[in-house]
């Protein structure tokens, strides 16, 4: 199987998000890469499901709370930006201050 760099990156996000969800299910607080992976994965999948950019920008702020992550992580993540594939093409989705 040959994957393009963009496809490899998406696959890495899926794997990282899966690992983060498993750790979260064990009661662990998420670190920076884990939190970004979960948010990124949900945005990519939301685009695939047909949600709009505006819907995803709003949805991205509901995925994780301060209680879900290690101390200091919310302050480290100012924006999460993902190029996602929508039915009408690829678009940039930006979520500002995703962990509240």
Curated annotation (Swiss-Prot):
Known catalytic reactions: urea + 2 H2O + H(+) = hydrogencarbonate + 2 NH4(+)
Entry-linked NCBIfam families: PRK13241.1, urease_gam
EC identifiers of the protein: 3.5.1.5
Protein name: Urease subunit gamma
GO biological process: urea catabolic process
Protein family membership: Belongs to the urease gamma subunit family.
Swiss-Prot/TrEMBL keywords: Cytoplasm, Hydrolase
Pathway: Nitrogen metabolism; urea degradation; CO(2) and NH(3) from urea (urease route): step 1/1
Subunit text: Heterotrimer of UreA (gamma), UreB (beta) and UreC (alpha) subunits. Three heterotrimers associate to form the active enzyme.
Origin species: Paenarthrobacter aurescens (strain TC1)
Keyword Hydrolase: yes
CDD domains per the UniProt record, alphabetical: Urease_gamma (cd00390)
Location relative to the cell: Cytoplasm
Keyword Hydrolase belongs to the record: yes
Cellular compartments per GO CC: cytoplasm
GO molecular function, one term: nickel cation binding
Highest rank taxon of the organism: Bacteria
């Amino acid at each position: 199987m040959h994957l393009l760099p963009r496809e490899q990156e998406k696959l890495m996000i899926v794997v990282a998000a899966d690992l983060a969800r498993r750790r979260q299910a064990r009661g662990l607080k998420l670190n920076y890469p884990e939190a970004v992976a979960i948010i990124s994965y949900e945005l990519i999948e939301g685009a695939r499901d047909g949600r709009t950019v505006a819907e995803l920008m709003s949805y991205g702020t509901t995925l994780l709370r301060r209680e879900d992550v290690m101390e200091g992580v919310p302050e480290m993540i100012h924006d999460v930006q993902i190029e996602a594939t929508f039915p009408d093409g690829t678009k940039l989705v930006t979520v500002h201050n995703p962990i509240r």
